[in-house]
Design a protein with these regions (language model features):
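Nucleotidyltransferase catalytic core that binds NTPs
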Residues: 1-144
């Protein structure tokens, strides 16, 4: 068995309307760590910061994540405080989409995690697929 770079990895998201982009992130994350924790945003959290409810309820989104072979543990994400997640799960690396790279809040988080011996690894998003795009297509179909 090949040793992976990290012992515990962590990623989080809504994972609404699960698609190949989600699967790619989970696969890439698992390639880097022995144990992958996936935090799925609760319906309340999504409503709070996106001002809309997810299409798929939390329990079903968590069940989907739990059935994926790359995922070792599913937890609920009740807030967006990544340092509290670090304190709770003590991960070696956090996996994040590269659209956050360079954002001042994430630069600060990188520094905080580094001081604890953890880091952030950014992954490129899969082109031309997102839950938002899927939602738009479904709405167009519904209108026809």
């Amino acid at each position: 068995m090949v040793m992976k770079k990290y012992k515990i990895g962590y990623t989080s998201g809504v994972f609404d309307l699960f698609h190949i982009g989600h699967l790619n992130i989970l696969r890439k994350a698992k390639e880097q760590c022995e144990f992958l924790i996936v935090a799925v945003s609760t319906d309340e959290l999504v409503r709070k910061y996106k001002n809309k409810a997810p299409v798929i309820p939390y329990e079903e989104r968590a069940a989907i994540e739990n059935s994926i072979k790359y995922v070792d543990k599913v937890v609920s994400q009740n807030n967006r405080d990544k340092m509290s997640a670090y304190m709770k799960y003590n991960f070696d690396v956090m996996f994040v989409g590269d659209d956050w790279k360079g954002n001042h809040l994430w630069i600060k988080l990188e520094e905080e995690l580094k001081s604890k011996g953890s880091e952030i690894m950014y992954f490129a998003y899969t082109n031309k697929v997102s839950s938002t795009l899927l939602r738009e297509v479904l709405n167009k179909i519904k209108e026809e």
